[in-house]
């Protein structure tokens, strides 16, 4: 499974991340409320994410953190991580990520 797209929609004032894969699965994550200005910060990571395996959340997040993931971008990175965990859970056929284990 590989990431084929990353999009951000501003719903109200809330950035909502959508990560799409070649397996027709989508993962969703959201940043903090009232931070629509995070959209370009989230999209900054798109070139890195394309082609990555979203089920390997820890490895992907390590790569993101090497590209800069601290303030003011922390919320942007968290939204991406939420979407990756959402995908990991869907790929495992469950509503929870497999790493949680319950």
Where do the language-model regions lie?
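Structured beta-strand/loop patches that form or line metal/cofactor-binding pockets in enzymes
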Residues: 1-29
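Metal- or metallocofactor-binding catalytic centers and their adjacent structured scaffolds
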Residues: 20-95
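Flexible hinge/switch segments at interdomain interfaces of large molecular machines
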Residues: 99-102
